[in-house]
């Protein structure tokens, strides 16, 4: 809250409202907000069209469409892939979940939401899928902002790359999930 004279001794400085980021399965109520998520044109080669990705996830029995919310408002989307060869096309020898089409709406980028959402995503998977020990995703090798956001959320790149793809070479990143106590 601002005092009338914010330069006076003892004046209080306005503190921004806390940003509460959480993730949730897409419901019919959240779906319109997810379909409205847009990335910048230069990013569309990395994640594609969100409305298409939502429809594709909802039609795949091995997928779960997820919304990223800030203070209850949809700002992003991703897809959990439960297939045994998800993301990298081969089995990993440990129970894992793939992450696809992770995106933050371009109007909400640059605020740290991506790394906080990725951390919330990992916590959600650990809580709702306690049998899973690993998350795996692929991120375009030139997407330095995305790579840094995933690293801040605990994902690591172990040197594996995937060639090809519609946007070019991608780093394979992993996030290990500790067992619940």
Residues covered by each model-derived region:
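Long, low-complexity, intrinsically disordered N-terminal extensions of eukaryotic proteins, enriched
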Residues: 1-7, 37, 122
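Terminal substrate-recognition subdomain of acyl/acetyltransferases
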Residues: 2-16, 161-181
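Acetyl-CoA-dependent GNAT
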Residues: 16-20, 25-101, 105-107, 115-120, ...
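Solvent-exposed beta-strand sheet faces enriched in polar/charged residues
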Residues: 81, 136-138, 158
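Active-site acidic-Proline motif in GNAT/NAT acetyltransferases
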Residues: 105-107, 111, 141-142
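Short glycine-rich hinge loops at helix-strand junctions in the catalytic core
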Residues: 112, 130, 154
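Conserved active-site alpha-helix within GNAT-family acetyltransferase domains
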Residues: 115, 141-159
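Conserved beta-strand-loop-alpha-helix junction that forms the acyl-donor binding cleft
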Residues: 131, 135-147, 163-168, 175-176
């Amino acid at each position: 809250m601002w005092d009338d004279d914010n330069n006076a001794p003892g004046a209080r400085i306005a503190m921004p409202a806390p940003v509460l980021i959480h993730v949730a399965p897409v419901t019919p109520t959240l779906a319109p907000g997810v379909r409205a998520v847009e990335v910048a044109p230069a990013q569309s080669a990395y994640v594609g069209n969100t409305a298409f990705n939502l429809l594709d996830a909802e039609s795949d029995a091995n997928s779960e469409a997820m919304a990223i919310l800030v203070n209850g408002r949809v700002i992003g989307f991703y897809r959990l892939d439960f297939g045994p060869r998800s993301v990298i096309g081969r089995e990993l020898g440990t129970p894992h979940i793939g992450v696809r089409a992770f995106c933050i709406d371009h109007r909400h980028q640059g605020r740290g939401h991506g790394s906080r959402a990725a951390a919330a995503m990992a916590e959600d998977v650990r809580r709702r899928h306690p049998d899973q020990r690993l998350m795996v995703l692929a991120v375009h090798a030139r997407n330095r902002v995305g790579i840094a956001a995933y690293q801040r959320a605990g994902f690591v790149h172990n040197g594996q790359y995937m060639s090809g793809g519609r946007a070019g070479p991608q780093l394979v990143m992993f996030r290990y999930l500790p067992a619940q106590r």
